[in-house]
Every structure is written in C-alpha cells, then in structure tokens.
Amino acid sequence: MKNHNYILSGFLLLLPLRITAQEFTAKRYIDTIRYEIKYGRIIIPVTVNQMQCKYILDTGGQTATIWEDAKTMGGKLTGANKVTADMNGKANMYSMGKLPKVKIGNHLILPELTTIALPNIKGFRDLGVVGILGGDAFKDVVMSLVSSSREIHIHYPYRPKGLKLNDGIPLADSETWQVNFPLSFSGTSVQVMFDTGVPELLTMNEKDYLLLAQIYAATVVHKGKGTLGAGLEGLAEPKHLKQVRLDKFTLGGKSFKNPTCLVASDVPTILGAEVLRYGIVTIDYPRGRFYFQPYKQSPVDLSKAAPIWSVSILPARGKFEIATVWEPLIDRVDIGDEVIAVNGKDITRLPLSEIAVSDIFDQITSSEATITIRRRKRKFDINIYRR
C-alpha cells in the first residue's frame, strides 16, 4: 500500500442493552482513562492482543488501523471490503479486518474488534498512533469526555449519576455508531455530528448553511477557495469555501454566541472537539443519548475565537503547497502554489507533514506573516494575515 499524507433523521427510541461478551465479564463498573492532546487530536492508549498502542479517538469515524501494525498485533483480514469516504467526501474501497483481544482501560474488553485496514499513513506515524478508534468500540458503554482533567470516564451499564434519560438529546440512528443529533440556530435545526476527530468547534455543509441563511441565521464573513484539510485519500479538489458567522446555539443550557464556522460542499456538518473546552460530553451509546454539562452556565461570546490565516499550507506532491486561500488574496495566490519559506525561514528541508507546518505557525505571535512562493521559476513574497 502506498503512503498517504493525512491530517486528517429519525431518532432512536430507548434501546435495550446489547448482550455482548462484556456483560459476562463485568456486571457493573466505572473506569477512568487518561488521554493526551496532540495537534488538537485526542489520543488514548489501547491494548491489542496484549500489545500497547495508541489511537486517535474519533467519534465521527469507524475504527481503522494501519494494517502493518494490525498484523503485528495479530490482526486478520476477513476477506470483506468496504467503500469508505474521508472528511472530504473522497471514497475508496478498503479491506476489512479483525483485531483480537482489544482492551480499553481496565474493564472494557472486546474479544475482537472490526477495523478498516489502512495503508501506511505518515500523519498517523507523526502522531505516534496506529489509527483511529471509532464509536463502534464504545457501542455498549456510556462514555464521558472530561477535558478539564483530560480523562475519559467509561460507565457500564448505566449513565453517570444525575443524568436522566429524558435530559439527553436523542441520537439519530447510525449503523456506524456516529453521534448525530439536531442543533438549533434561531429555531431552525440542522443535523450535526459530534466528531472528536475534528479539532474545530463547527464546520458546515453548503445545504445547511443555505437553510440557515434563509432565516438570516448565517452571514458570510469571508469567501475563499481550496480544501478544509487532507483526508485519508489526500487533498480534495479545490472548492468554494465560506467563513460564516452564525446565530447563537445552546447546549446543556449554555449559550454559544457569535460562533463562526467554515462552509463547504460535500462535507458533513460537525460539532468538533473544541466544544469540550466548555463542558463535559457524555455519550450513552446503548440508549442513544447525547449530554452536555457545561463547566460554567454563563454564555460564551465566540466573536473573537479561532482566527484563521488568509492561506493554509499542506504537504502535497512532494512539497508544501497552498491548500486554501481567502479574500483578499484569491487573485494573487493560486491553489497548488509551492511555499518555500515562512517569515524568511526556509521550509523546503522540513519533513513533509502537516505537523511541521503547524509548528511554524504556532510560533508566530503576531497577526501578520510573510510567505515566499515559488511559481515556476519566479519567487515572490506575499503578506498573509490572521483574522
């Protein structure tokens, strides 16, 4: 398999608890798993066939493992194949496999876990993980994400004390255990997917944006073109993008005022991991409920949160390229332009990874920077801005 670059409505009724192997190994437990954050990704320890490894927690995806690592841990291909789309809507057919004796924490023990067999993905290697762990691994338990202590609390078979079934938001049915539920803006609901694999607060598809724009609950702030990021299948074809200001939304009684999000076609509408800064998220998978317990009940104003640069840079085709460009630079910078320096620092010898780019921009304290572009045989500087 070739290397890939990465970086990555009906409601359920009350469901009976599933009878699984786990129910015969533990009647009731509460467990705590410490996690780490790397470049906005939640990374958790997992044991497969008594071998330690790490996965990205991705509540919006299905469990997927670099097959080279899976084989080392005793993984076996099933002979089945599955067509799976990445974050950009680009689809490919992957082989399916089984991982033996998967242990998450001290008590969540799965005799086997189905996984998508992935090629060698450099971005995963850079993060020190073997893949992504989806909701399918937690389908029989209640999971709470507590960002204040960087812990995952696993409850089986009941929810944490104080959380009532009727207080939760019902989840839409999902064969892949995605966490989908309605989120309301000015009285109009759109279906969102809670996805810990996306660091941002919100992204939105074009259809949902148009629905909210009709009731004046969404206003375009900036226009751009490009891609929101690299998925398992690499960069998507450039598309029209928007940065949009939304009306407030409420979760768990907490108001989020003036949120912004990026809008593109062919992407899901996502509530990302940034929401964990503001409260505890609990997912009751067996009963299909989503809970949000805010750390503070006071409203939060997001009007100045998460500014973005007027270009984004990603590794592609053996070099660092412009992946996204926003107004007013659309007529001066082309998608695919090679970037050879940032603030005069040569980046052509850096490892071709998104992490290398992130490290450079994380060190910039001002809201302005200069990039050097090489277009054919010509080099020129462009000032870019964070806003």
Question: Predicted regions span which residues?
Answer:
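Bacterial Sec-dependent N-terminal signal peptides
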Residues: 1-26
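Pepsin/retropepsin-fold aspartyl endopeptidases
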Residues: 21-387
